[in-house]
Design a protein with these regions (language model features):
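Glycine-rich, basic loop-to-helix element that forms the pyrophosphate-binding segment
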Residues: 103-120, 184-193
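Acidic donor-binding loop at a coil-to-helix junction in glycosyltransferase catalytic cores
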Residues: 219-225, 258-261
Length: 430
C-alpha cells in the first residue's frame, strides 16, 4: 500500500483525475509522479503505424496443426515486417510474407526471440508466441502508450481461449497468463509483478540495451527481462483494454507440466532477483499473528491483529485520511495478508507444511483452510464450472507449481524462492 500526502492544489488535481475532467495548469509534476508510482494510468490515444512494429514469432512447429496456426497468425500482420525464428522444428517452416531464420538446434524461446531481435530495424518490436493471437489494430492501439520516453514495454491482457473442456473453463478464471482487468505499472512486488511474453510490445532499442532475453532460462525469461528493465528505471505498463488470446493446455499432463516449469523458474529467478520472488511479503506484526495461529494461541493472534489494525489506522489518519476510511483500509490490508499467506501455504510452502503437519496436527486445519477457502471464494465470483472440479483443478495447479519450486530449489542449491520478505513497518511514500 502506498499513501500520498497532497496539498490543497494537489487534491483538486487528484479529484479531477478521478472524475476524468480536464486538468488545471501546473498539473504535470503531480501527474508525472502519480504515473511513475502506478497510482494513475494513461489513456490509449493515437495509434502507431503497422510499419513501425516488427512482429517476432518464436516457433517450434511439431505438426501440420502447428503449421496452420503459424500461417493464420502471420496472416494477421500483413502490413507489418514479420520475422519467424524456427527453433529447430521437426517440420521446416516456410510462410509467405515473413522472414524465417532457422536454428540448427533447439535453443528455447529466449534465444529464438533474441535471434530475431538482432534483425529488427523498426522502432518497436512485438513478441507474439505461436499459441497466442492479437490483431494488428490492437497492437497499434496498444503502442499509443509509448508517449513517455521512459516507457519501454507495454503489454495487453492475455485471456485464455475458451472451449468445451473443464480445463478450458478453469483457465478462463485462473490462467497464469491473464493478469486481470485493471491497468497497472508492471514492477516487482506490485499487483502486476510481471506479464507473459506471449504478447509483448517493446521499444527495440531498450530491449537490446538490457541484453534481450536471458538465453540460459527456458522458463521465466519474460519475468527476468521485465525485472531487469524495472531495475534499470524503465517503466513497463499493462493495459487490459487491449486483449489478446492464448490457447490453454489441452491435457491435464500438459497443464501439470506448464505449472511445474513455472515453479521451476522461480528458483532461478530468486537466485538472480532475490526478494522479488518472495512467496509472502508482510510486516512483523502480521508475522506475529500468523505464528500465533500456527501455535494455536488465540490470545496472541488477537493482540497482534489489534496492534496491526491500530498502527495501520493511525498511520493513515496521520497523513490525512479520514478515520473511517483509514480503519477500512487497515482491515483490507489484514485480509489481503491472510490471502497471500494462504497462497504461500498452498504454493511455495505446500510440501513444507505437509511435512510439518505430521508433527503439528494444528497445521492440518491451516492447510485445509488455505486450500478450500480461497478456491471457494474465487469460484463464487465466476461460477463458470462445478465448484468441486474447480477446487480440485486449483489444487493440482498449486501442487504442480510447488513441486516445480522445490525441484528448482534443489537444483539451484538455494532456498531464496521459499524465504518470505518481512518488513518492520509499512513502506511510506508521499
Amino acid at each position: 500500500l502506498r499513501a500520498f500526502r497532497l496539498s490543497q492544489a494537489g487534491m483538486v488535481i487528484a479529484d479531477a483525475l478521478e472524475r476524468g475532467e480536464e486538468l488545471a495548469n501546473g498539473h504535470e509534476q503531480l501527474t508525472t509522479r502519480l504515473l511513475q508510482a502506478g497510482a494513475v494510468h494513461p489513456h490509449l490515444s493515437e495509434a502507431l503505424k503497422p510499419e513501425d512494429i516488427t512482429i517476432v514469432i518464436p516457433a517450434f512447429v511439431r505438426d501440420s496443426t502447428d503449421m496452420s496456426t503459424l500461417q493464420k497468425l502471420t496472416a494477421l500482420f500483413q502490413n507489418h515486417p514479420v520475422i519467424i525464428t524456427d527453433d529447430a522444428s521437426p517440420l521446416r517452416i516456410d510462410v509467405d510474407g515473413a522472414v524465417v531464420i532457422r536454428h540448427s538446434t533447439n535453443r528455447g524461446p529466449a534465444a529464438a526471440r533474441n535471434t530475431a531481435l538482432e534483425k529488427v530495424s523498426t522502432t518497436y518490436v512485438a513478441f507474439v508466441d505461436l499459441d497466442a493471437s492479437i490483431t494488428s489494430d490492437q497492437l497499434c492501439c496498444l503502442g499509443s502508450l509509448f508517449k513517455g520516453a521512459d516507457i519501454g514495454v507495454v503489454a495487453p491482457r492475455v485471456a485464455s481461449q475458451e472451449s468445451a473442456s473443464q480445463l478450458s473453463h478453469y483457465e478462463v478464471v485462473r490462467s497464469p497468463l491473464d493478469m486481470g482487468v485493471l491497468p497497472a505499472l508492471i514492477r516487482p512486488g506490485s499487483r502486476v509483478p510481471y506479464v507473459p511474453a506471449a504478447i509483448l510490445l517493446a521499444r527495440t532499442a531498450i530491449v537490446r540495451h538490457v541484453g534481450g532475453f536471458n538465453e540460459t532460462m527456458r522458463y521465466g525469461e519474460d519475468v527476468d527481462l521485465l525485472w531487469r528493465l524495472s531495475d534499470a528505471g524503465i517503466m513497463c505498463r499493462y493495459e487490459p483494454q487491449v486483449t489478446g488470446v492464448h490457447t490453454p493446455r489441452a491435457s491435464l499432463r500438459k497443464f501439470f507440466l506448464q505449472r511445474f516449469h513455472y515453479g521451476l523458474s522461480a528458483a532461478v529467478l530468486a537466485k538472480n532477483h532475490r526478494s522479488y520472488v518472495a512467496p509472502f511479503a508482510t510486516n512483523i506484526l502480521m508475522i506475529g499473528s500468523l505464528i500465533s495461529v500456527v501455535a494455536c494461541a488465540p490470545l496472541f493472534v488477537g493482540l497482534f491483529l489489534l496492534a496491526q489494525f491500530v498502527s495501520s489506522s493511525v498511520m493513515l489518519f496521520r497523513i490525512g485520511d479520514d478515520l473511517a476510511h483509514a480503519c477500512t483500509t487497515a482491515i483490507m490490508n489484514i485480509v489481503y495478508s491472510a490471502r497471500t499467506f494462504a497462497d504461500a501455504v498452498t504454493r511455495a510452502w505446500f510440501w513444507l507444511f505437509i511435512i510439518l503437519a505430521i508433527f503439528f496436527p494444528s497445521l492440518r486445519w491451516i492447510i485445509a483452510g488455505s486450500v478450500v477457502l480461497p478456491a471457494v471464494s474465487q469460484w463464487s465470483r465466476h461460477r463458470a464450472m462445478n465448484p468441486l472440479t474447480f477446487v480440485v483443478l486449483r489444487s493440482i495447479d498449486n501442487f504442480s507449481y510447488c513441486t516445480g519450486v522445490w525441484c528448482g530449489v534443489l537444483q539451484q542449491k538455494s532456498f531464496a524462492a521459499l524465504v518470505p520478505k518481512i518488513t518492520v513497518w509499512w513502506r511510506r511514500a508521499g
